[in-house]
Amino acid sequence: MSKAKLDPGAGVRGAIRGAASHLVLAVVCLSAGAGLAWTVGRRPALDAVTTHGEWVYLRQPGSPDSVRAYGAYPERKDKAPGVIVIHEIFGLTDWEPTVVDRLAKSGYVAIVPDLLSSRFGRSPADPDSGRKLVAQLEPARVTGDLNAAFAYLDSLPAVRKGDIGVIGFCWGGTQSFRYATDNPDLRAAVVCYGQPPDSAALARIRAPILGVYAENDARTDASLPDVAARLKALGKAFTYEIYPGTGHGFLKPGRQGSDGPQVERAWGNILAFFKDKLGG
């Protein structure tokens, strides 16, 4: 897959302009009302919001490879901010589209690309197989596929141009942190229990970053004080919280703490962060 070269001076839009013209709309409309079911902590206020979801295929200029993605839109009269969702190390599962729907119900046009699809066709149903395939992804390919998602959102008439953020979980949290070093046009990044990039790369970050971490996840949390100090020294906006009584991946059903109060508290903080940085 050909990659768009990022030029921090010109910005990603210049580097990947025209990507939207290579978009193939696939187009199975999945929701015209409630969307996919949100399985944890759903609130009545969210249920009242009408959303529409569809599968699309994104393509970068000059490449035969396409990226399968699920997107959802809120029904609103004005333009909305956009959010890219990055899946876990297991590939795209049934859970990530529910995250997209939750964001749409909160007023965002959101999309989750299947980052295995441009190379392997789509994510496998078996988590172990997905993990093995994710391990084979080159960082440049992941960045290119995320650029395609960014360009797609930025081209939509329903999205306020430029008001785009990213959120990732587990491996996706690591990619969210890394993508903030590669895309100077991002307005906000949320890292859910992800590892930071190397110290030199941190200097390239422009977007404010919110970190969501679990108390019982020492392997991931160990570097946080040093990373926070480094980003503060660089003048970067980075805040994080470690949620008590939770384990790695706690925002996903079935993980330690996923049925406790910290899930809704974390989501409240995530949505407040996006509203502050991207607008409502």
Show where each model-derived region lies:
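Serine-hydrolase catalytic machinery in alpha/beta-hydrolase-like enzymes
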Residues: L46-V49, W55-S155, F250-G254
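An N-terminal hydrophobic leader/cap segment in hydrolases
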Residues: A15-R59, V67-R68
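A conserved short beta-strand
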Residues: D185-G194
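Acidic catalytic loop of the alpha/beta-hydrolase fold
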Residues: N216-D221
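C-terminal catalytic histidine-bearing segment of alpha/beta-hydrolase fold enzymes
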Residues: K232, A237-G280
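Alpha/beta-hydrolase fold nucleophile elbow
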Residues: A158-F169
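Short beta-strand/loop motif that positions the catalytic acidic residue
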Residues: G211-Y213
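Gly/Ala-rich beta-loop-alpha elbow adjacent to hydrolase catalytic centers
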Residues: G168-G172, S176
